[in-house]
C-alpha cells in the first residue's frame, strides 16, 4: 500500500528520519521551516492527487505522516472506507508498525553484517599490523560502534512496541484526542464544495505527550476489536460576556464650541473602542471651520431677530426704490419739465416763423392744429402740446 522509502521517513522518538539525497535536499534543522515546508508540500500532493482523479477517473488515496505523528489522508469515494472506518484505521496503523519494524530489523541486520565483516577483517590482519589493530579497538569510535551494535536488537523490539501502543491508543474508542484534518480545505483556488464526495481526509493523533503511561499492546488490541464506535470529547459551552461602557464626563469647550464626552479608561466589561466627539443637538456654536466676521455676525443677528428671516442689505439696490413707489414732489415735476422742454424745441425747429407757418392765427391754425391762435402776440407763436404727463406745464412759451 505504501512505499517503504516514504515510511522510513517516519520520525521515531525525536530522531532525524530523513538525511537527504545526493541532489541537494537535506533535513531542515529549523523547526518553523520544516512545518512550513510540510504544509506547502502536503497541499501540493493532495492537489495533484485530486487533479489525477478528476482528469483520469482513477481511484487515488494519499497517506502523509508528519514528524509529530499526525496522519493526513486523501482518498476518492471508493477508497473512503479505507481511511474512515475503524478497520481501515487499524489497517493503516498495522502497516505503519510493520514498516517501522522492518526498517529496524533491516538496520539491525546491516549492523550485524558490518560487525561480522569487521571481525573477519580483524582476524585476517597480518602480524605486522597487530599494534594498529589494538589501537583501533581501543579507540573511542570503535567502542561506540560496538555498543550501538549490541543495543540494536533491544532497540528494535522496544521501539516497535512503543509505536504500536501509541498507534492503537489513538484508534481505540477511549482515546479522546482523535483529530480530523481535511487536506484540501486550505488550498487557494480549489473548489472543495463542488466535489464533496472526493474528499475523505482524516487525521489520527498518534501521541500527544511522551509522559503518558501506555497500557499493553494486547489490551489495546482487544479494546479496538470489541468496539465499533468512537467517543469524541464534548464541545466546550459558549460563554457570553456582556460589555457595558463607562459613563463619560461631558465637557464643553468655549473656544471650539463643541460639547463632547471624555473617553476615560474602560473596565473589563467595557468595549475596546472609544467614543468619537459628538456635537450637542440642542445647541449651535461657532466652530473653527467657519470663521466669524462682522458681516456674518450681523446676518446671524438679523436672522434671529427678523420674523421673515430676511437678512438686511449692506449696499443700496441697483434700482432706487424712489422710482418704484414715491409720491409726486417738486423735484420730480422739474425732471418732467426738462424732458418736455426737449420735445418743445423739436417741434419749434420744424415750424419756424420764417417758413410762413404760424405767422398769423389763420396760417398757424390751418398748418399746425396744436398752435393756440388765441395766445399769438406780435407774431410770436405759442404752442400747446398734448398733455402727456398730466402736469401744469401745458402751455410753454418758446
From Swiss-Prot:
Domain MADS-box: 20-74
Amino acid composition bias (Low complexity), ranges on this chain: 106-121
Bias (Polar residues): 262-273, 282-294
Keyword annotations from UniProtKB, A to Z: Activator, DNA-binding, Nucleus, Transcription, Transcription regulation
Pfam families named among the record's database cross-references: SRF-TF
Keyword Kinase annotated: no
Region spans: Disordered: 1-30, 101-125, 254-317
Gene Ontology biological process terms, A to Z: induction of conjugation with cellular fusion; positive regulation of transcription by RNA polymerase II; regulation of transcription by RNA polymerase II; signaling
Subcellular location: Nucleus
GO CC terms of this entry: nucleus
GO MF entries: DNA-binding transcription activator activity, RNA polymerase II-specific; DNA-binding transcription factor activity, RNA polymerase II-specific; protein dimerization activity; RNA polymerase II cis-regulatory region sequence-specific DNA binding
Top-level taxon of origin: Eukaryota
Database matches in Gene3D superfamilies: Transcription factor, MADS-box
Matching InterPro entries: MADS-box/MEF2_TF, SRF-like_MADS-box, TF_MADSbox, TF_MADSbox_sf
Function: In response to mating-pheromone signaling or nitrogen starvation, it interacts with mat1-Pc. This activates the expression of one of two mating-type-specific genes sxa2 or map3, which leads to inactivation of the P-factor. May also interact with mat1-Mc.
PANTHER family in the record: SERUM RESPONSE FACTOR HOMOLOG (PTHR48019)
Protein name, entry field: Pheromone receptor transcription activator
Amino acid at each position: 500500500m505504501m512505499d517503504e522509502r516514504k515510511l522510513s521517513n517516519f520520525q521515531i522518538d525525536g530522531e532525524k528520519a530523513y538525511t537527504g539525497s545526493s541532489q541537494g535536499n537535506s533535513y531542515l534543522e529549523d523547526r518553523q521551516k520544516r512545518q512550513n515546508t510540510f504544509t506547502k508540500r502536503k497541499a501540493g500532493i493532495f492537489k495533484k492527487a485530486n487533479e489525477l482523479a478528476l482528469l483520469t477517473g482513477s481511484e487515488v488515496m494519499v497517506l502523509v505522516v508528519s514528524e509529530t505523528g499526525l496522519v493526513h489522508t486523501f482518498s476518492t469515494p471508493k477508497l473512503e472506507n479505507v481511511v474512515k472506518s475503524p478497520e481501515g484505521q487499524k489497517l493503516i496503523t498495522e502497516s505503519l508498525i510493520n514498516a517501522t519494524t522492518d526498517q529496524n530489523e533491516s538496520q539491525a541486520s546491516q549492523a550485524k553484517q558490518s560487525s561480522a565483516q569487521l571481525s573477519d577483517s580483524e582476524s585476517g590482519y597480518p602480524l605486522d599490523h597487530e599494534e594498529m589493530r589494538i589501537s583501533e579497538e581501543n579507540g573511542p569510535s570503535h567502542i561506540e560502534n560496538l555498543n550501538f551494535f549490541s543495543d540494536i536488537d533491544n532497540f528494535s523490539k522496544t521501539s516497535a512496541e512503543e509505536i504500536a501502543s501509541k498507534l492503537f491508543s489513538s484508534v481505540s474508542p477511549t482515546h479522546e484526542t482523535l483529530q480530523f484534518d481535511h487536506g484540501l480545505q486550505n488550498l487557494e483556488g480549489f473548489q472543495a464544495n463542488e466535489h464533496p464526495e472526493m474528499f475523505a481526509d482524516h487525521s489520527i493523533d498518534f501521541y500527544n505527550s511522551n509522559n503518558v503511561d501506555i497500557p499493553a499492546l494486547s489490551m489495546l488490541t482487544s479494546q479496538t476489536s470489541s468496539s465499533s464506535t468512537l467517543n469524541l470529547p464534548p464541545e466546550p459551552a459558549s460563554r457570553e460576556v456582556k460589555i457595558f461602557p463607562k459613563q463619560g464626563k461631558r465637557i464643553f469647550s468655549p473656544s471650539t464650541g463643541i460639547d463632547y464626552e471624555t473617553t476615560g479608561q474602560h473596565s473589563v466589561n467595557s468595549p475596546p473602542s472609544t467614543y468619537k466627539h459628538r456635537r450637542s443637538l440642542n445647541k449651535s456654536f461657532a466652530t473653527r471651520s467657519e470663521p466669524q466676521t462682522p458681516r456674518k455676525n450681523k446676518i446671524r443677528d438679523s436672522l434671529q431677530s427678523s420674523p421673515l428671516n430676511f437678512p438686511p442689505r449692506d449696499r443700496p439696490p441697483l434700482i432706487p426704490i424712489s422710482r418704484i413707489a414715491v409720491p409726486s414732489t417738486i423735484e420730480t415735476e422739474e425732471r418732467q419739465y426738462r424732458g418736455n422742454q426737449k420735445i418743445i424745441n423739436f417741434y419749434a425747429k420744424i415750424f419756424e416763423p420764417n417758413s410762413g407757418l404760424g405767422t398769423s392765427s389763420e396760417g398757424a391754425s390751418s398748418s399746425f392744429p396744436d398752435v393756440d391762435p388765441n395766445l399769438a402776440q406780435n407774431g410770436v407763436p405759442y404752442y400747446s402740446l398734448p398733455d402727456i404727463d398730466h402736469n401744469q406745464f401745458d402751455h410753454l412759451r418758446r
